[in-house]
């Protein structure tokens, strides 16, 4: 026991050196502070009316894996501006292209991806369930209608989206655009919100408190306009495109639900437990909202590689984590990525499959936030 006082003194000295108290609360995973760039429109061009003849893809596949992405050069300033320029589609079928400028751009902002020639040309059965199916169907209106599950919505094209503002939904670009043209149904795109379905026509704000919901149904709101980055339109799933597989939808009216803010994706090692979470409308469980969580297996600057169980229909789901927000002294969930699709990757000569999420980087945060708020001064905190 004689060594215990000496050990205690050593611990105290270590705490003083690290400027913390030996009696402080356990460490909390904290949202990092970032010096964010600014992405601003510079010019807008009118384009010909859009075509809507692409077949909806509920998943995107790519064979360019982590090493392929990590080994490619950074884009030039002009290339980064090109990728972050964007196309806007309006409800009447008209569209515009907006070119952007980037300010306070650091060396690490964005990567252009090349194709891994050794990983192409393979045809394998896609497997999006890893061992035991770890997904959870969410039942009961007390869960479905409350945060965070209530932020998940269904797109009329078959994908999932997440409420990120009073009138805005974040989803995957491939849910509305195949990289060349718009998906069938995008011109009349709608977003579905789960609501209780009452018997005998009861329900809504004027229904009696004794009315019991029979089951859930979708209530739909039309989309006013969509934004898709040119990095997606000019690329494809085997090139840089997957890095830009995200889109923002603006609704015709507010949805009146609590939404989840977007945030810059921290490094995987800073995520609580190294895990991510997301909920979506997987096609193999029709009508059900399906929740899952899993560990991040690898990462690049733009992508998170994981093996969360998922099926087509979950694409576009917002990937989120819950961390401590120091200025407000509270826990907060934020969307840090968008679930995109599936990849077969050659890892040291053997095939490995992943599900992939697009990370919200500082540049992407600046772009998406500007789409939502329309004022870069409101986008200084990621």
From Swiss-Prot:
Cystine residue pairs: 159-175
Keyword Signal: yes
Cell compartment(s), UniProt: Secreted
InterPro entries for this protein: Glutamyl_endopeptidase, Peptidase_S1_PA, Peptidase_S1_PA_chymotrypsin, Trypsin_dom, TRYPSIN_HIS
Leader peptide range in chain numbering: 1-22
Glycosylation sites: 92, 206
The keyword Transcription appears for this protein: no
GO annotations of cellular component type: extracellular space; nucleus
UniProt KW keywords: Disulfide bond, Glycoprotein, Hydrolase, Protease, Secreted, Serine protease, Signal
GO molecular function terms noted in the UniProt entry: serine-type endopeptidase activity
Gene Ontology BP terms: proteolysis
Superkingdom, taxonomy of origin: Eukaryota
Enzyme Commission code: 3.4.21.-
Residues annotated as catalytic: 174 (charge relay system), 239 (charge relay system), 315 (charge relay system)
Homology family: Belongs to the peptidase S1 family.
Protein name as it appears in the record: Serine protease 23
Source organism per UniProt: Mus musculus
Upper classification of the organism: Eukaryota, Metazoa, Chordata, Craniata, Vertebrata
UniProt gene name: Prss23
């Amino acid at each position: 026991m004689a060594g215990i006082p000496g050990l205690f003194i050593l611990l105290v000295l270590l705490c003083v050196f690290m400027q913390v108290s030996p009696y402080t609360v356990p460490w909390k995973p904290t949202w990092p502070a970032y010096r964010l760039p600014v992405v601003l429109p510079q010019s807008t061009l009118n384009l010909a009316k859009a075509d809507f003849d692409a077949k909806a893809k509920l998943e995107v596949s790519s064979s360019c894996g982590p090493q392929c992405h990590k080994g490619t050069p950074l884009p030039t300033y002009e290339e980064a501006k090109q990728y972050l320029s964007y196309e806007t589609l309006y409800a009447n079928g008209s569209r515009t292209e907006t070119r952007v400028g980037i300010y306070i751009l650091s060396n690490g902002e964005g990567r252009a991806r090349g194709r891994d020639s050794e990983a192409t040309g393979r045809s394998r059965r896609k497997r999006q369930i890893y061992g035991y199916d770890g997904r959870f169907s969410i039942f009961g209106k007390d869960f479905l209608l409350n945060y965070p599950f209530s932020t998940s919505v269904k797109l009329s094209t078959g994908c999932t989206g997440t409420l990120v503002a009073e009138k805005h939904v974040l989803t995957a670009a491939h849910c509305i655009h195949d990289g060349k043209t718009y998906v069938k149904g995008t011109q009349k795109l709608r977003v579905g919100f789960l609501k209780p379905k009452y018997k005998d026509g009861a329900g809504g704000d004027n229904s009696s408190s004794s009315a019991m919901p029979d089951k859930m149904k979708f209530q739909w709101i039309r989309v006013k306009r969509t934004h898709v980055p040119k990095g997606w339109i000019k690329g494809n799933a085997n090139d840089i495109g997957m890095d830009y597989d995200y889109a923002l939808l603006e609704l015709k009216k507010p949805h009146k639900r609590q939404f989840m803010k977007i945030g810059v994706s921290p490094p995987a090692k800073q995520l609580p437990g190294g895990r991510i979470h997301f909920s979506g409308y997987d096609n193999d469980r029709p009508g059900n909202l399906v929740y899952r969580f899993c560990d991040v297996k690898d990462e690049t600057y733009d992508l998170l590689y994981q093996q969360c169980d998922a099926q087509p229909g979950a694409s576009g789901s917002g990937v989120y984590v819950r961390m401590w927000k120091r200025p407000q002294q509270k826990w907060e969930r934020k969307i840090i990525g968008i679930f995109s699709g599936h990849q077969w990757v050659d890892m040291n000569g053997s095939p490995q499959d992943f599900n992939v999420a697009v990370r919200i980087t500082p540049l992407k945060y600046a772009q998406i936030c500007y789409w939502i708020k329309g004022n870069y001064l409101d986008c200084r905190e990621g």
